[in-house]
Amino acid sequence: LTPPEPAEPEVASHYTRLSQMNYSVEHGPYPLGSCTMKYNPKFIEDVAALEDGAIHPDRPDEYAQGTLGILHGLQEYLAEIGGMETATLQPPAGAAGEFTGLLVARAYHRSNDEDDQRREVIVPASAHGTNFASAAMAGYDVVELPSDEDGRVPVDALEEAVGESTAALMLTNPNTLGLFERDIEEIAEIVHDAGGLLYYDGANLNALLGRARPGDMGFDIMHYNVHKTFATPHGGGGPGAGPVGVVDELAEFLPRPRVRERDGRYELYDPERSIGKVHGYQGNWLVLVKAYAYIARLGDAGLKDTSAKAVLNANYLAERIDYDIPYGPFHHEFAATAGERDAADIAKGMLDYGV
């Protein structure tokens, strides 16, 4: 058989035409997920394609200092952004990060001989949807907490729900309606007084970047959705990453191996009380490189500007559309009522007009 020998312009035209047959974030809005979707800058693809990053994960530490340095640097970036003591990069997705964080919570309660007692995880109705499944997979009974008339966590109902059986409260702040939990400090106190842990779902971290940190609000564990906040690819089934940050007293339970700096060198080590591995090696390396490059490129001022524009864009859109918005004030997103219109028709219209 004679292989085809098309000219380069023909090949370029062919693949360009194929790309135009698919829908992508370059063609229009990408409204997947309850989070702030955005354009991912293409420079991070160049960074991830560098040959220096293509090393074998079993290479000895002394010959992988650059790679370990990036992993350690990303841990430090994320911990600082979230107000945590440290972080693990191993979980391969946001939901996997939730599962990992809850396994850390179980290990903590087990270390206090309370694992058999603390069998419940409280999840508000306004929480990110995966929280319910993650808690169940971690072996917990899920207690759903209805929202109050303002769309937030009702403090009175929370006080009745917590007790000696409470392992954790999972909270998304701002929540799926874009509402900030204004009673967060009181909520944290209620959970901690009952002996539970406060878990932060980072789905909506875009609204807080550079302006507020979950750790300062009283959260003990959090996961970061790098595909929602730090410009890594979204959707498609992976590969992905869902780093988990924790406060100091929970650090010893994080997955192994961990990356640390000692005497000016980076090394891997296994904490004695680790929950073990949740993914191969240090997670999906090239995804993590993209998140590192994005954070390093923006810096403190850039991250702060990102959150400002996320909130500004949502509020600008709310002023422009003619729909009923029952809750507010909101941050990076809002929920609107379609009224007599069909929500599916609205979505199709957005695609038709490239809104």
What function would you assign to each model-found segment?
Residues 31-59, 323-355:
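Terminal amphipathic helices with adjacent charged low-complexity linkers/tails
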Residues 8-11, 15-21, 51-92, 97:
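Conserved N-terminal alpha-helix of the aminotransferase class I/II PLP-enzyme fold
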Residues 23-44, 90-101, 230-245, 282-293:
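Conserved phosphate/anionic-ligand binding catalytic regions in large, soluble enzymes, centered on
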Residues 1-52:
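N-terminal glycine-rich, Lys/His-bearing helix-loop that initiates the first secondary-structure elements
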Residues 49-62, 80, 136-146, 165-170, ...:
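Gly-rich Lys/Arg/Thr-decorated short loops/hinges at beta-loop-alpha junctions or inter-strand turns
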Residues 31-40, 91-97, 124-127, 204-210, ...:
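A glycine-rich phosphate-binding loop feature that marks nucleotide/adenosyl-phosphate handling sites
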